[in-house]
Amino acid sequence: MKTMSIWVASATLFLASMGICSCSMGSTTTSEMRGSLEFTQDDLREKPFKAIDVDMVASVYYTQNDGDECSVRLDYSAIKDAEFAQKLKEKIKVVYRDGEVKIGLTGRLKVPAMCNSEKNRLKIYITSPDLVKITQEGVGAFYAKSINSDRLEIDNEGVGSVSINKILANRLDVTNEGVGSVSIEHAKGDVMKIDNEGVGSVKVGNVAMGDLKVDNEGVGSVTLDFFKGGNLKINNDGVGKVSAKVDCQ
C-alpha cells in the first residue's frame, strides 16, 4: 500500500498589490493592446521550437504532432473590422529565438468594441513535435487537447486562461500568477507542482502523480477533483481555498 502524507497549513490573510492592465474585453468601449516586442531580422525566420510565449489578445490552439513540423498560423478571418485587422497585421510579430516562439506586438493598438469578444478575435494555430513550456501573458486563451512531454511548464501570467484536456509528463509545473485560470482535465506523470499566486484559479480533474505539491498563496482557489498517487502536500497561505478528493488506497 502506498503511503500518503497530507499537510494543510492554516490560511492567513494575503494582501498584495497587483499591476493589471484591464482591457475591458467584451465591453462596448474601445480597449487597447500594448506591446514592445524586440527582434532582429533573423528572429523572424522560422526555426524549430519547444516553447510558446503569447503576449497579446488572441485565442491559441496548440496541436502536438508526431513528425518534425514546427509551424505557426495566424487566422484573421474572425475579425470583422478590416481596418483593425490590417493594423494588427502590421503590429504583430512572430519571433523565433532560443528554441522558443514568441508572439506579440511592436507597439500600441486600439481594439474596436466589436473585436473585443473571443469569437471575433485573432486565432493562432501552433503545432510542434514537443513542448516544454507555455507562457500566457495576454488576455486571450490557450487550448490543447493532448500534450506528451518529458517535462512541461505552464506559466499563466495575464488575464487569460489555459485549458488542456490531457497531459502526460514526468515533471509538470503549473504557475498561475494573474487573473486568469488554468484548467487540466487529466494529468499523469511522476512529479507535479502547482503554484497559484494570483486572483485566478487552478482546476485539475484526474491527477495520477507520484508526488504532488500545491502552494496556494493568492486570492484564487485550487481544486483537485481526484488525486491518486504517492505523496500530496498542500500549503494554503492565501485567501482562497484548496479542495482535493484523494484515493488513499
List where the protein language model places each region.
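Intrinsically disordered, low-complexity terminal regions
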Residues: 2-249
